[in-house]
């Protein structure tokens, strides 16, 4: 169960202090690191970071899947090049078979849930979704069935909803049950998303946004907006709340990272009264 992960960098190396948490956030145990340098010319060098890692015993059968290996390669490169966040949710690539971008959607849902009245931290919510990696995968499957231009299927939406409900009935811990049901409600409440949109060069947009029917999301404080849009990216998070189909409003830069939705909701209440 010992594997080697080799990272090649052009004219740049990676310190062990930076590489260690990135590798371990994917669920590997880092055993050693051997650096090599290949000199191409006076000004050009290739640095090779050879990481020796231990694969969790229960995942040895999965790690030989070529599709999963490609997902891991893409995700690890994305984490080292700061295209995705490096946090423990990246374990969902190895444990749940999700791609780096699919994990980013789950991460966006976690960030949104942390802004609601759910009495748990983003870290605890993440731990729960990692523990129930199968449900996290089903949540993405539900999202895909609702919004993917190629795989949209109302029948499949209903089938996946029934599967998730059956899995939720097996959860015994009250806190975990509350978190998973809240995540389920978020996906069910989604109306639109930019997840599948691409730029002119064919790459995905560097941010993910989703529009929700607020009244369908569990644990939201009253009054409920009619709709809200949450935006997640590596650089920032944002929310847009609407009290009605026609509404006045404005922009606000918030320093309240942990509860900016509460701040914006207060402003919306004031606008609705006016």
Residue ranges and their predicted role:
Residues 1-274:
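Extended, well-ordered protein cores
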């Amino acid at each position: 169960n010992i594997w080697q992960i080799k990272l090649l960098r052009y004219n740049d190396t990676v310190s062990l202090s930076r590489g260690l948490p990135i590798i371990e956030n994917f669920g590997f145990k880092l055993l050693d690191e051997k650096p090599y340098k290949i000199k191409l010319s006076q000004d050009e060098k290739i640095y090779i970071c050879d990481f020796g890692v231990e694969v969790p015993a229960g995942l040895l059968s999965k790690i030989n899947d070529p599709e999963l290996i490609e997902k891991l390669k893409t995700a690890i490169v994305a984490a080292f090049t700061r295209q995705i966040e490096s946090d423990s949710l990246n374990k969902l690539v190895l444990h749940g078979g999700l791609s780096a971008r699919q994990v980013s959607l789950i991460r966006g849902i976690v960030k949104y849930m942390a802004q609601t009245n759910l009495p748990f931290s983003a870290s605890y919510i993440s731990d729960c979704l990692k523990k129930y990696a199968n449900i996290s995968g089903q949540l993405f499957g539900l999202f895909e069935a609702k919004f993917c231009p190629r795989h949209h299927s109302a029948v499949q939406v209903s089938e996946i909803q029934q599967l998730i409900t059956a899995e939720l009935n097996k959860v015994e811990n009250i806190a975990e049950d509350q978190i998973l049901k809240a995540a389920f409600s978020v996906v069910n409440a989604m109306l639109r998303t930019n997840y599948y949109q691409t730029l002119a060069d064919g790459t995905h947009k560097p941010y993910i946004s989703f529009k929700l029917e607020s009244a369908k999301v569990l644990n939201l404080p009253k009054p409920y907006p009619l709709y809200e849009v949450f935006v997640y990216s590596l650089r920032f998070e944002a929310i847009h709340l609407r009290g009605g189909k026609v509404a006045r409003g404005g922009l606000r830069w918030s320093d309240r990272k942990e509860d900016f939705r509460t701040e914006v909701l207060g402003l919306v209440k004031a606008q609705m009264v006016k």
